[in-house]
């Protein structure tokens, strides 16, 4: 199977099927929710997902912008990497037509629609190298809707603001977002690096499965504390008030300048869509 065909199937899977961990988290949220209106909203979300699977149509009308996380193993040369990138672009074009995906990607100033979700650096491909893979690549399709993406935030805190400053910024951001990102949400937080790195870490944090804690115990405890505090805000499903505002909180960190404390926040809606595939490359790509 060509890489472009794999990309089509990954975006089809991501658009139609929620990952099992997300489905289970929504079911748990439904059981725990005490607000009748939020409980009914969660019930509607769960039923919506079943209908999407049965009818093979995307589970949300906003099929997002196409984001790809690409891991490249060893023994893959630069010309092969360029070929892989072209195959990913071709796959996004085909997926837009075949799944179908809504053609969301437009010119930022003229608002001209590219019709294919490909153009001006889209799809957005994040590349990293992994020596544990030998002539293998890993592709994660990660469609991202506008409602949650528009609630992203970045703040360059003072180092003296410390952990309390980070907590306050996160809670202020979620409180101000309210129902706009279509809760129950998943919250990705990037701490450290530079401004751009913090936001990239926050986006990457959203790739984790619900319940998957950070390997550093201190960070893991901060994730749990923030989840509890966010759910105490009472925003509830779709902002209608309730116990469950977030399904999980994930944090990623990086070293930063001694005079900086960047914090990036990326929010994912209840439709926490992602699909992953590893591919062993042929002798000649």
From Swiss-Prot:
Catalytic reactions of this protein: (2R,3R)-tartrate = oxaloacetate + H2O
UniProt entry keywords in alphabetical sequence: 4Fe-4S, Iron, Iron-sulfur, Lyase, Metal-binding
InterPro entries listed in its UniProt record: Class-I_Fumarase/Tartrate_DH (IPR051208), Fe-S_hydro-lyase_TtdA-typ_cat (IPR004646)
Domain of life: Archaea
E.C. number(s) listed in UniProt: 4.2.1.32
Cofactor list: iron-sulfur cluster
Gene Ontology biological process: tricarboxylic acid cycle
Binding site for iron-sulfur cluster: 60, 182, 269
Record-level GO cellular component terms: cytosol
GO molecular function list: 4 iron, 4 sulfur cluster binding; fumarate hydratase activity; L(+)-tartrate dehydratase activity; metal ion binding
First-tier enzyme category under EC: lyase
Quaternary assembly: Tetramer of two alpha and two beta subunits.
Similarity comment: family membership: Belongs to the class-I fumarase family.
NCBIfam families recorded: PRK06246.1, ttdA_fumA_fumB
Protein's name according to its UniProt entry: Putative L(+)-tartrate dehydratase subunit alpha
Protein's organism: Methanocaldococcus jannaschii (strain ATCC 43067 / DSM 2661 / JAL-1 / JCM 10045 / NBRC 100440)
Source species taxonomy: Archaea, Methanobacteriati, Methanobacteriota, Methanomada group, Methanococci
């Amino acid at each position: 199977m060509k890489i472009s065909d794999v990309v089509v199937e990954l975006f089809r899977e991501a658009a139609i099927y929620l990952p099992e961990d997300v489905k289970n988290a929504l079911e748990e949220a439904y059981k725990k929710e005490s607000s009748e209106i939020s409980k009914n909203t969660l019930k509607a979300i769960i039923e919506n997902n079943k209908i999407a699977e049965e009818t093979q149509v995307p589970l949300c009308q906003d099929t997002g912008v196409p984001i790809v996380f690409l891991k490249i193993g060893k023994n893959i040369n630069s010309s092969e990497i360029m070929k892989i990138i072209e195959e990913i672009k071709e796959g996004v074009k085909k997926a837009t037509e075949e799944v179908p995906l809504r053609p969301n990607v437009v010119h930022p100033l003229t608002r001209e629609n590219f019709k294919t979700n490909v153009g001006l650096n889209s799809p957005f491909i994040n590349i990293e190298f992994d020596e544990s893979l030998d002539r293998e690549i890993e592709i994660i399709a990660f469609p991202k809707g506008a409602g949650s993406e528009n609630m992203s935030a970045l703040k360059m805190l003072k180092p003296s603001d410390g952990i309390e400053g980070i907590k306050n910024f996160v809670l202020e951001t979620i409180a101000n977002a309210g129902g706009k990102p279509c809760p129950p949400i998943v919250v990705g937080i990037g701490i450290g690096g530079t401004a751009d790195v913090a936001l990239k870490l926050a986006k990457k944090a959203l790739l984790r499965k619900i319940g998957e804690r950070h390997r550093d115990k201190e960070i893991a405890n901060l994730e749990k504390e923030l989840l509890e505090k966010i759910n105490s805000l009472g925003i509830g499903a779709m902002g209608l008030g309730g116990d469950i505002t977030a399904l999980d909180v994930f944090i990623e960190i990086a070293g930063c300048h001694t005079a900086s404390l960047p914090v990036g926040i990326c929010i994912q809606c209840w439709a926490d869509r992602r699909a992953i595939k590893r591919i062993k490359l042929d002798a000649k790509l």
